[in-house]
Amino acid sequence: MKLSEFVKTEYGKSISECTNEELYYALLTLTKKMASGKQHGNSKKKLYYISAEFLIGKLLSNNLINLGIYDEVKEELAQNGKNICEIEEFEKEPSLGNGGLGRLAACFIDSIATLGLNGDGVGLNYHFGLFRQIFENNMQTTVPDPWLTKKSWLTKTDVTYDIKFKGMTVKSRMYDIDVIGYNNTSNKLHLFDIESVDESIVEDGINFNKEDIKKNLTLFLYPDDSDEAGRILRIYQQYFMVSSAAQLILDECVAKGCNLHDLSDYVVIQINDTHPTMVIPELIRLLVERGLEMDEAIEAVTKSCAYTNHTILAEALEKWPIYYLKKAVPQLMPIIEVLDDKVRRKYHNQAVYIIDGEERVHMAHIDIHYSSSVNGVASLHTEILKNNELHHFYEIYPEKFNNKTNGITFRRWLLHCNPQLTELITSLIGDGFKKDATQLEKLLDYKNDEKVLKQILEIKSAKKMELKKALMEKQNVTINENSIFDIQIKRLHEYKRQQLNALYVIHKYLEIKAGKKPSTPITVIFGAKAAPAYIIAQDIIHLILCLQQLINNDPEVSPYLNVVMVENYNVTWAEKLIPACDISEQISLASKEASGTGNMKFMLNGALTLGTEDGANVEIHELVGDDNIYIFGDSSDTVVERYAQGSYHAAKYYNENAAIKEAVDFITGEELKAIGDKDRLERLFNELVSKDWFMTFPDFDEYVKTREQAYADYENREEWVQKMLVNIAKAGYFSSDRTIEEYNRDIWKLED
């Protein structure tokens, strides 16, 4: 049905007579109707992809693209004087995720549907997400980020489950969002909500009574865990998610006539990081309730589950005190104790026990022992898991460990966010790359085509102008569209080293003040949220915002250097920032970033990577070659060795390296103290000089040198655009379609 016909039926008027808001809701309704007519994957075995977060972004344009009607709708609107981008402004971005974990899950469910596989996502329906970030007095403040409206992509279902906690039973309700594949099937994202949730209990900022479980359970993603009540709330949340998921899985199996002894013939559960780990003991418990012997239930669940590890950071591998579990979900402890006892009888190595000597349950250990597959998300990450972090487990289960390098959906990160580049590529090599991204390699035939290279530069300039306009409209910030756009966008964490970028900004500021001006102006853009309980991360944001105020208001410096931090960074911002970027900052401490996917999105849109040999940067480097990437810093082996020997002392670098000392001293100097918070700046200074746990200082000199080389190379626009083209052409490997094909081939084994 054409939009004009639908609008006539819905509102009794023409497109030109409708408001943009009416048109948005008409398109939403029409899209949902079309999705409901699409076939769902229907193989005997079904995948359940369980994740605490799904950072899906706005859905309207992406769904129209995947339905194959975007151009038609855009044209029909334009003929009636309407702009689809303005209509899209009425859509609220779903607050269902935060960082790379959630964005990966969103890309994966898109690819699962596109490949026609029988698989649904399962998560929670957060009302306020992580939080909405607001900058006040050069500091991050947090407020709820509501997104639910009466008409939305959510569809309320009749599916409800009783979830039993200690001393109370609550009811979960399932809501569905259609996951529309590109010209293929439509699957579901199942989001569970608690029936008794009460948004009114949120008071100042994002504060609420953490012990009022019936009212607070699905309000926020990752509630503040700086106190015991917050940590126990996370257990309630996780169990609520997995118990709902487990009951759904068993109900759907029984409806298909499945013999529960043969669960793995019908079900595969992908556990995305450790947040859904409790699905393993919960499924075992439910199977025993339904008549299976304990050993049978354990075997059935182990064969059905697969675990993806996303981190080597010890703090992110969840370990819950037994006391917490007994307080919230005591029914799981007998199962967990059986699982631990089996491990202890078989392996006499405390490093692999589920329950440690401090009476804590290691969630990742449950996943590894009682799943059939354990995968890392980039080749380097998987090798580090096998040889270092999870080496004891690798010795026991070498056959379980495998690598699945992450990927991104090109439908959103090229077709949707960069239609101009998509159109150019299509005109050169056809549209086969939209379903087979490796076809992008055909672009290499145009590496010396001056006309094509000129068009690529023109598209980049146009995307810079779009970003300039967005920053002016949203934040009243002016940037120079003719400057180098140097961008770092990712959640704020010390290992991602936004502090290293900030130290470079200080270094550059001082150079300009001393009279050394860059050939081309530079705009350094940050986007990041810091967890409310992560004080140093908030201090780093404070430093960046102080630098923004200082530099942008300095008439000597601002013509040559600007700093911008986008407020409330999310998918919508990423879709504007990534196509406009020249230099992609991927500067995590080597060995600490599992993969990263921002690096892939930037590469696909023609940005050049400035990064360490970490995560997927390693594979980008291998694909594009030394001449088309900027690599610096210590190797992962050097970093791991330094940690093992305890041989790194930040103060030594600070005292012996004049450039480091000058930049770090500036943090507590008079210029920043005049506009910043003295305590925050001094705390960050002390953290760097006394600890610098993520080794900013050892990489500083080489980082400065490599970044300056990238800026120098930018001056040769002919060679620079050739590097851009190589990056775009080589990005095809990082399609999430390829990643999902590998998961299915090696782990899930879903039939066509």
What are these regions (language model features)?
Residues M1-D752:
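A conserved ligand/cofactor-binding region detector
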